[in-house]
Amino acid sequence: IFINVKCSSPQQCLKPCKAAFGISAGGKCINGKCKCYP
């Protein structure tokens, strides 16, 4: 699930993904945007 957070590294997506989907969520940075894996 893509969220509206810009990124340049996967680490930048972990906090917003966990905030949106819970502590077990993961995240990747794809094409400059965060993609979360709930």
Curated annotation (Swiss-Prot):
Family matches, as PROSITE patterns: SCORP_SHORT_TOXIN
Gene3D superfamilies: Knottin, scorpion toxin-like
Taxonomic superkingdom: Eukaryota
Cellular component, GO, one term: extracellular region
Subcellular location: Secreted
An MF annotation (GO) of this entry: potassium channel regulator activity
InterPro entries associated with the record: Scorpion_toxin-like_sf, Scorpion_toxinS_K_inh
Tissue: Expressed by the venom gland.
Presence of keyword Disulfide bond: yes
Keywords: Disulfide bond, Ion channel impairing toxin, Neurotoxin, Potassium channel impairing toxin, Secreted, Toxin, Voltage-gated potassium channel impairing toxin
Transferase listed as a keyword: no
Residues of the site described as Basic residue of the functional dyad: 28
Cystine bridges: 7-29, 13-34, 17-36
Positions of the record's site feature: Aromatic residue of the functional dyad: 37
Known function: Selective inhibitor of voltage-gated potassium channels, blocks the Kv1.2/KCNA2 (Kd=1.3 nM) and Kv1.3/KCNA3 (Kd=7.2 nM) channels. Association and dissociation rates of the toxin are slower for Kv1.2/KCNA2 than for Kv1.3/KCNA3.
Domains: entry comment: Has the structural arrangement of an alpha-helix connected to a beta-sheet by disulfide bonds (CSalpha/beta).
Family: Belongs to the short scorpion toxin superfamily. Potassium channel inhibitor family. Alpha-KTx 02 subfamily.
Note: Negative results: does not inhibit the potassium channels Kv1.1/KCNA1, Kv1.4/KCNA4, Kv1.5/KCNA5, Kv2.1/KCNB1, Kv11.1/KCNH2, KCa3.1/KCNN4, KCa1.1/KCNMA1 and the sodium channel Nav1.5/SCN5A.
Record's protein name: Potassium channel toxin alpha-KTx 2.13
